[in-house]
Amino acid sequence: MPMQPSIRSLLQRWWPLGLALLAACLLRLCLWGNLPRQGMVSDEAEYFASAVWLAQGRGFSWHQEWLWTRAPLYPFFVAIHIRLFGISPTPVYISQFLLGLVQVALTYFLAMALVPASARAHDWRRWVPGLSALLLGLLFPLAVYYQVLLSETLYIAIILAGLLALVYWANSPSLQSRRAYLFLAAAGILFGLASLTRTLAVGFVAVAAGWVFLTVWLHAGSAQSLKERLWKSLLPAAIPLVVAGMVIAPWSVYASRAYGGFVAVDTTGAFNLLLGARTAYDGDRKDAPTRNFVLALLNTHMSQKEREVYLGSSCLAHHQDPRIFAAMERPSAEITQAQRQQLMTAEGLCLLQERPLAFVQKSLAELIDFFRINYGGDERFTNGFTTGRLHPSFVLATFLFDDTLYVLALPLAIIGWTLLRQLEKRDQTMLLACSTLIAWWLLYNLLTAPLLFAINRFRVPLLPMLLIFASYAVLALGAKAWGALNRRHAPHLVLAGLLAFVVAAPASWISAYNPQSDSYRAQESYFGPHPSSVVDTYLGLSSRDRYLASEQLRLDLANDQLESANILLASGRVDPNTTLLGRAIIEGREGRPEAGLALFPSEEQLALADRAWQARAAVVRGDLLRRLGEERAAKNTFTPRVVDDYNPVEWAWEWLKPSPPSDGRIDFGGNLDLGYIRGFYLGEGDGTDTWRWSAGEAALRFPEMGTGAPQSLRLRIDGLSSGLHNPSLVVAIDGRQVAMLELSREVQVYELELPATPTGEDVIIELHSPVFVPSAADLIAQQGPKVGQLRLLGVRLDWAELE
């Protein structure tokens, strides 16, 4: 049966969009559950924690104890999912998956609006929307971000929709018709929502209104009187401005009441202003001074002496500002977030006045960093790439669909924008106005982001527009349309070349320093030595075999295949540090712990090693001492700060197979529990007792303690500290529930009977519990390698005993 003409015409018209959506869908499905995560990144913990409290009906109170307050829309977006589906990010990821496809479609429609309608059916320009959407669908940052609890996915979708509404207004038959005004109102709503997602968009509302004013003013012509022309231009310009204000105002009222003073959207701007000013003043980027200043206004556990040190050394104190001394005299609990915002702003402005030229210099450096590639950025999930932990497909996708696509698109976008305005200038006035709008959006971000501080994530909202113009340039090149460029376009071409040089050139071409000298600081780039994208990609790929060998070693040790482990170690495929640990573990397992200890270098040499390896070495040495029965020495080995910093609970569970605990008891947080526990946070003291909080999924291991008969398990649990109304604990073995404990609101010992485990085998007990999110103070307390890692707390245990 022949295909109906209407269906055929639809396919002919929309197949490029369908192809782009399919490519985006396939890439995101390939990434589902496969991000090389090592924990939460950037602001994920803050967003998720505040959303959980919001979903529980506690409003935005979580931010009362945080360093700043946050725009509400993204926490609200996450909170809806938590309210409906529980404390899990997976439903959020699914919604963000769909939003990613919406971004592709919006980019397609925006590109269609920027290409002359008469040209789409006849020449190369008809392919611009499809190519733009396809490139955006393959853009790796956006493909990754749908599984990240950051606002980018939602924010970019809203921004694209807002820009599209303005472009549709400009393409309306009449700029002052009812339909045109509806587009302006829609743009106002969308930019208002964007402002409630990220405060940076607030300023662009005024920029967009200015663009509307100029568009109407130029379109009106000089035949009308100045007053009539002004009135006709002001009315449309006021619509998005007023509507956006109406969207933002209710939240401003709520936030101002909740945070004890005027807060327009959030207080992140004040914090970032202080951070940027502090960086300029000190000549170096250090977060600690800014953080300590804010903590002195926030942390109720900080001593008055510490507060006086941090606040007394401020710029405001140096200038005898009475506001800072008044804050010093008040308890931190009485200082509101709005007052902290005022003091952060005042301190930032004070520092700027001290060294204004340094701030200009810092901002220019930030502008360059804004364009540079940062291969190891948190949101790229590439940290530790030299260990080989990244799958080759992820490494190659990052190189091709992130770095390479960006390096090519950036200069091509400038050329494409120039070509668009040159080729369409004769009879497409509104098209030129729309390209001006996009240019204003790009310039607005370039001017505002580096003023405070710039990270690669901040440039992602610009990429959809850059890809549209880059697609135009590529297709124009194929059609030999670059001949339209002339001498008047030389500045644009120079700018394109300069940006290409900045992002792609090796650092040695830019820096005046000798790379071999101590003063040389490597700069990120696309080409050149480390940390360039090309070299780091090679390092990530070439180190994969060593990582796989280390993983095979871990599996051999876990499965008691010591002979296979020795053969692997002798092959030289395992890196030297892991080889040392592996040999020491095998010596201990074969009954020669003294020989294992003798393999380690001296304490002085250990102190010079990588801190993560120091922690693992301490765990192995402590286990060997524990096998010798030297518990005091083992405790001292497990105790160093570096072990606490990394809390290597999971690593010890996977690599060690310790001897049975003395008296059949695991003492949580007592410095001898590593290797026996999984899914527990750092230990903490409480009087004479030590405790550990469990995560939602945890486990206990009693090595070789199976008796072939039922056994008794005793747990000392603190139900009083739980943040849950009805704390509970499910105990299971091999996935089968053994007991369900309803915990009382007190410290209590619970006893239960376990089914028989074969004689001499490990008794592994699984613990499952609902979790709660502690206050923001708990997240602030996570420092060192655990900074930014949200703790989802289950139950608090003192000890576990198996009889």
Locations of the language-model features?
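Membrane-interface transmembrane helices that cradle and orient dolichyl/undecaprenyl
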Residues: 119-123, 162-186, 194, 212-223, ...
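Membrane-proximal stem/loop segments at transmembrane-domain junctions that anchor or position
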Residues: 264-376
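Membrane-interface anchor segments at the N-terminal boundary of transmembrane helices
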Residues: 90-94, 333, 351, 358-438
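Multi-pass, polyprenyl lipid-linked donor-dependent membrane glycosyltransferases
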Residues: 42, 69, 73, 91-101, ...
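Transmembrane-helix motifs of polytopic, lipid-linked glycan transferases
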Residues: 94-122, 161, 165, 411-418
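Transmembrane-helix signature of polytopic, membrane-embedded enzymes
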Residues: 17-20, 107-138, 156-157, 178, ...
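Transmembrane signal-anchor helices characteristic of membrane glycosylation enzymes that use polyprenol
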Residues: 13-41, 138, 242-256, 504-508
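Membrane-proximal lumenal/periplasmic loop motifs of glycosylation machinery
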Residues: 33-45, 56-93, 350-351
